[in-house]
Regions:
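Helix-to-loop junction immediately C-terminal to a conserved catalytic motif
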Residues: 53
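A short, proline-enriched helix->beta-strand linker immediately N-terminal to the Walker B motif
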Residues: 160-164
Length: 223
């Protein structure tokens, strides 16, 4: 479970261009929910997602993940917790174009502290690619894929470590409506397997397929 209490995020702190992106955001995300974070451009959606995913730190407030306070953790502990519990899907896919699908999805396992033989790692990679319908392309380089296929690979990489918490930043933003529908079906299946899924989106059709919506405007949660 995720608990956010009065989260404040300030960019360029102490400088002339100081900017407070989040103004006391409080929210609770229960295990197994599929949630959309919506709002206008610049409202603070991605900032909040980056805080949830340990990509960015907050300046005030409290973030508790599965009973563990995040704020006082050092970078090493945060990296370990992120690798074990959180899967992150970035807006630009963040895949290595010249790598094969298999080698891209393998990366989180190579950084994991879980002791696994190479065969077990490869089995996990194949299972993750199969879950998103990309197993048959595992030896193909990413640069040969369409946008929708790349998104599927990004999802496979995010779930290969078996995280309980999946975060996605505008995962359908560059996709057509048909591909968006296919990707949302993948997220739905992942959620039905018991994972918590949080999707930042500006697409109402995506938000409508989630169980709950958190709306952010001007750095605050609005009802």
């Amino acid at each position: 479970m995720v608990q956010l209490k009065d989260i404040v995020k300030i960019y360029n702190k102490g400088k002339s261009n100081e900017f407070e992106a989040l103004h006391g955001v409080s929210a609770e995300i229960k295990d197994g929910e599929m949630i959309a974070i919506v709002g206008t451009s610049g409202a603070g959606k991605s900032t909040l997602l980056h805080i949830l995913g340990f990509i960015d730190r907050y300046d005030k407030g409290e973030y508790i993940l599965d009973g563990t306070p995040v704020g006082k953790m050092n970078e090493i502990k945060m990296a370990h917790l992120r690798n074990e519990k959180i899967g992150m899907i970035m807006q630009d896919f963040a895949l290595i174009e010249d790598y094969t699908l298999r080698d891209n999805v393998l990366i989180p396992l190579d950084f994991s502290k879980k002791k696994m033989r190479k065969k077990e790692k490869l089995n996990r990679v194949i299972s993750a690619l199969e879950a998103v319908g990309m197993k048959e392309h595992c030896h193909k380089p990413v640069k040969q894929l369409s946008g929708g296929q790349k998104q599927r690979v990004a999802i496979a990489r995010a779930i290969v470590n078996d995280p309980s918490f999946l975060l996605a930043d505008e995962p359908t933003g560059a996709l057509d409506s048909k591909t968006t529908d296919e990707i949302m079906k993948v997220f739905k299946r992942i959620n039905e397997e018991g994972r918590t899924v949080v999707i930042v989106t500006h697409d109402n059709s995506v938000a409508e397929r989630c169980s709950r919506v958190i709306r952010i405007e001007d750095g605050m949660v609005v009802k």
